[in-house]
Amino acid sequence: MGSFVLITGGSGAGKTTIARSVENLRLPDCEVHFFDSIGVPSVEQMRTEYGLGHEPGGAWQRAMTLQWMRRIRTILDRGISVLREGQLRIAFIREALTENQISGAHVILLDCDDATRTQRLCSDRLQPDLANRDMMNWARYLREEAEEADVKILDTGRLPIAECVRVIVECLTSGGCNQLRPKAANH
C-alpha cells in the first residue's frame, strides 16, 4: 500500500500552493489530488442534496470526504502514494479512514495567522470576500480540532514554502510524520 498524506486548513493557508509544488516534483508512484477538483456546488444545491449542514464542515463536506477516500483506497492498494489537499475536518477524515480500512495516514494542518491569511486572500488570490470573520473562525476551528487530535501543524506564515514541501515529501516517501489513527470502534 502506498503512503497517504492529507493536508487540510482554511482558505489562504497555502494548501494548493504547497500541493502544486509537490506535484511539480513529479515524485515516482505518487499522485496529488485536490478536493475542489470535484467541483463545489452552490449553497442551494448543497442544501437541496445534503440538507442542513452545507456550511464548511457540514454534510456535503462529510459526504465528499467519504467519497474521495473510497477513490484513494483503490489508488493506495495499487502501491501508489497519494497527497490529498482540501478543507477537511479531521473528524470526517478519521471516519473515512475507518470506513475504508486505511491505516497509517499522515494528516497535516496548514495554518497561518489571521493577518497572513487576510493578506493572501486579498492580495495574492484576489478573493477579499473570503477574508471574513467566518473564514477566520473556520481556520480556528480546524486548528483546535488538529490540536485535540494531535495532528502535525505547519505554520505557513512562518515557514518557507520549500520547508513545508520538504516535510510533506518526507511523509510521502519515508513516513516521517505523525499518523492519524482510524476512529476507534464503539464496543
Features from the language model and the residues they span:
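Conserved phosphate-donor/acceptor-positioning beta-strand/loop module used by diverse small-molecule
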Residues: 86, 101-123
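Small-molecule kinase domains that catalyze NTP-dependent phosphoryl transfer to phosphate-bearing small molecules
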Residues: 127-167
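Conserved substrate/cofactor phosphate-moiety recognition/catalytic segment
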Residues: 20-69
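Walker A/P-loop
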Residues: 16
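ATP-binding Walker
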Residues: 13
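Hydrophobic anchor at the beta1->P-loop junction of P-loop NTPases
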Residues: 7
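Glycine-rich phosphate-binding loop used to anchor ATP phosphates in small-molecule kinases
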Residues: 59-102
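P-loop (Walker A) phosphate-binding loop of NTP-binding proteins
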Residues: 10
